[in-house]
Regions:
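Glycosyltransferases and closely related glycan-assembly transferases
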Residues: 83-96, 104-119, 132-140
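Short amphipathic alpha-helix
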Residues: 13-25
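Conserved nucleotide-sugar phosphate-binding/catalytic loop shared by glycosyltransferases and other
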Residues: 3-10, 26, 30-76, 81
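Active-site-proximal region of nucleotide-activated glycan assembly enzymes
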Residues: 53, 112-180, 188
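Cofactor-binding loop segments of dinucleotide-utilizing enzymes, especially the Rossmann-like FAD-
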Residues: 8, 38-40, 59, 123, ...
Length: 204
């Protein structure tokens, strides 16, 4: 089985993508997986560090607040579409998976036009622009939250939850020990409520 996984820009897209790749490799040992991302973005470092090959496209996001910065946008998009078509032809995937971020647009569009099975994985309760644009063309849309029919065609939605890293799933067997260690590390006690706050758009 040959799989292309595309998307990125932030850790919120990249790490679920790597988790998907790892899950595929666990189930299909001989699966060939190719990542496609955006040149100069985080995925160009994180994906090879995880042991996977990645090809970068010159694609860039549309600047909605700084319109004057969009002069090169159509040229980069056209170049990315041409390169995406070449990648699809050369790699010949059985399925193409998009995880969000503008890098996934060209490769998913190309796969749809060539009748290759496609799906997108939406990690958020409010989908990104690229996934909303791609929704009508892809075969399936994997979501982590209910009521996503507000944004996507109901007949394409599959509730899967969010992919998690293998090292996180392995924590379950040592949860009691880890909990004790965490309480000690952060000087916390169980007689008071504990609130964890995370935020940011770069994988926090």
């Amino acid at each position: 089985m040959k799989v292309i996984i595309s998307g990125g820009g932030t850790g919120g897209h990249i790490f679920p993508a790597i988790s998907i790749a790892n899950a595929i490799k666990c189930k299909y040992k001989d699966a060939e997986i190719l990542f496609v991302g955006a040149k100069g973005k985080m995925e160009m470092q994180k994906v090879p560090q995880a042991g996977y090959e990645i090809i970068g496209l010159p694609v860039a996001g549309f600047q909605r607040k700084r319109l004057w910065k969009n002069f090169s946008f159509p040229f980069k998009l056209l170049s990315s579409m041409q390169k995406a078509k070449k990648i699809i032809k050369t790699f010949s995937p059985d399925i193409v998976i998009g995880v969000g971020g503008y890098a996934s647009g060209p490769i998913l569009r190309s796969a749809v036009s060539q009748k290759i099975p496609t799906l997108i994985q939406e990690q958020n309760s409010y989908p990104g622009v690229t996934n909303k644009i791609l929704a009508d063309g892809v075969n399936r849309i994997c979501v982590a939250y209910e009521n996503m029919e507000r944004w996507f065609p109901t007949n394409k939605i599959v509730f899967t939850g969010n992919p998690i890293r293998q090292n996180i799933s392995l924590l379950e067997s040592n949860m009691a020990e880890i909990k004790t260690m965490a309480l000690k590390t952060f000087s916390l006690t169980l007689d008071k409520p504990i609130v964890l706050v995370v935020g940011g758009s770069l994988g926090a």
